[in-house]
C-alpha cells in the first residue's frame, strides 16, 4: 500500500512523502526545507532514498543539497531535464522518458511536461495520485513566471484529462485565497460554494485541504472552466472595455490569470 504524507514547510508549502508499506525507505517530492524532512525521517525511523522535483524554484529545491549530505550522497534525484537544478541525478522529459519506476515503490510513475509556471515544469502521476508542483492548485493555478498563457492552459487541460478520481497533491495551501477569487468570478456555482465551506472548516482545524481531486477541480476551478458562460460574463464585466468581445478559451484564461494576479 502506497501512503502519501504531508510535511509542512515554510508558511504554506507541502513536501510529500511517498512510502510503500511495509518498506521504511521513502521518497520526498519538492523538499524546499531539509530540516523538516530530516525531523520527519528520524521521528518515524525512515530512510530517504530519493527525491522527485517538479521545477527549479528554491522553495521546492532548497533542501536537496543538505538531504544529499545527510544521506551520504546515496540519493537518486529526479527532476526536469531542461531546468538548472543542482543535484539532479536522473533528468526527466516526458517525450524521452514518459514512464519510470522507483525502488521500493510499486507501479510506474508517469512524467508529464506542464510548462507555464516555469519553462520546464514537470508533474508526476503514480496510481491515482498527481504531484503537480505549482501548476494546478485547488481552485487555482500557478503564476506565469516563465511560460505563456497558451502553455499553461495546455498544461492544465492535460491534467484535467486525467481520471476523475485522481488525487491532486499540489505544493501549496492556497485553497482559501483561490476560492475567494473563484467565487468572485463564478458566484452561482453551488459545488464551489459547498467546497468553500468545507475548506474553511478544515483550515479552522488547521487541517489540509489537499489532496483535492480532478473531478472536484473540473467542477470548481475557474482556470479549468474559462469558457463557462458565467465566468466569461464576469470577465467581461471586470474588463469593461471587452464587454462586446468574443472571447475564446485562451483569451478568457489569459484575462482570468491577469485578474487573479491583481486580485
UniProtKB/Swiss-Prot annotation:
Which keywords does UniProt give here? Hydrolase, Metal-binding, Zinc
Do you know which Gene3D superfamilies this protein is assigned to? Ribonuclease Z/Hydroxyacylglutathione hydrolase-like (3.60.15.10)
- Amino-acid positions noted as binding Zn(2+) 2 in the UniProt annotation, renumbered to this chain: 59-60, 134, 172
Q: Name one GO biological process term.
A: methylglyoxal catabolic process to D-lactate via S-lactoyl-glutathione
Please indicate if the UniProt record lists Zinc as a keyword: yes
The residues that the entry says bind Zn(2+) 1 are 55, 57, 117, 134
Q: Which Pfam families would you find in this protein's record?
A: HAGH_C, Lactamase_B
Pathway listed for it?
Secondary metabolite metabolism; methylglyoxal degradation; (R)-lactate from methylglyoxal: step 2/2
Free-text remark on how the cofactor is bound: Binds 2 Zn(2+) ions per subunit.
- InterPro entries named among the record's database cross-references: Clx_II_MBL, Glyoxalase_II_hydrolase, HAGH_C, Hydroxyacylglutathione_Hdrlase, Metallo-B-lactamas, RibonucZ/Hydroxyglut_hydro
Record EC number? 3.1.2.6
Q: Is Metal-binding a UniProt keyword of this protein?
A: yes
Reported cofactor(s): Zn(2+)
Q: Which domain of life is it from?
A: Bacteria
**Which top-level enzyme class is recorded in the Swiss-Prot or TrEMBL entry?**
hydrolase
User: Which transformation does this protein catalyse, written as a reaction?
Assistant: an S-(2-hydroxyacyl)glutathione + H2O = a 2-hydroxy carboxylate + glutathione + H(+)
Q: Which GO terms describe its molecular function?
A: hydroxyacylglutathione hydrolase activity; metal ion binding
Functional summary from the UniProt entry: Thiolesterase that catalyzes the hydrolysis of S-D-lactoyl-glutathione to form glutathione and D-lactic acid.
- Record note on quaternary structure: Monomer.
Q: Which family does it belong to?
A: Belongs to the metallo-beta-lactamase superfamily. Glyoxalase II family.
Which protein are we looking at?
Hydroxyacylglutathione hydrolase
Q: Which gene encodes it?
A: gloB
Amino acid at each position: 500500500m502506497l501512503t502519501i504524507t504531508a510535511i509542512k514547510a515554510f508558511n504554506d508549502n507541502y513536501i510529500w512523502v511517498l512510502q510503500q508499506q511495509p518498506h521504511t525507505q521513502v521518497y520526498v517530492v519538492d523538499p524546499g526545507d531539509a530540516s523538516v524532512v530530516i525531523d520527519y525521517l528520524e521521528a518515524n525511523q525512515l530512510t530517504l532514498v530519493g527525491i522527485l522535483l517538479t521545477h527549479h524554484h528554491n522553495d521546492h529545491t532548497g533542501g536537496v543539497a543538505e538531504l544529499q549530505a545527510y544521506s551520504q550522497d546515496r540519493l537518486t534525484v529526479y527532476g526536469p531535464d531542461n531546468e538548472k537544478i543542482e543535484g539532479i541525478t536522473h533528468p526527466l522529459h516526458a517525450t524521452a522518458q514518459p514512464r519510470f519506476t522507483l525502488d521500493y515503490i510499486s507501479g510506474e510513475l508517469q512524467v508529464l511536461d506542464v510548462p507555464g509556471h516555469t519553462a520546464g515544469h514537470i508533474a508526476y502521476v503514480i496510481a491515482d495520485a498527481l504531484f503537480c508542483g505549482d501548476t494546478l492548485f485547488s481552485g487555482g493555478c500557478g503564476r506565469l513566471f516563465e511560460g505563456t498563457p497558451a502553455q499553461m492552459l495546455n498544461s492544465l487541460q492535460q491534467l484535467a484529462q486525467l481520471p476523475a478520481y485522481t488525487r491532486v497533491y499540489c505544493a501549496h495551501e492556497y485553497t482559501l485565497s483561490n476560492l475567494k477569487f473563484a467565487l468572485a468570478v463564478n458566484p452561482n456555482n453551488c459545488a464551489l460554494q459547498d467546497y468553500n465551506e468545507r475548506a474553511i472548516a478544515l483550515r479552522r482545524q488547521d487541517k489540509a485541504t489537499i489532496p483535492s481531486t480532478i473531478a472536484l477541480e473540473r467542477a470548481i476551478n475557474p482556470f479549468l472552466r474559462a469558457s463557462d458562460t458565467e465566468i466569461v460574463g464576469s470577465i467581461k464585466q471586470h474588463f469593461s472595455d471587452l464587454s462586446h468581445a468574443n472571447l475564446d478559451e485562451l483569451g478568457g484564461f489569459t484575462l482570468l490569470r491577469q485578474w487573479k494576479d491583481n486580485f
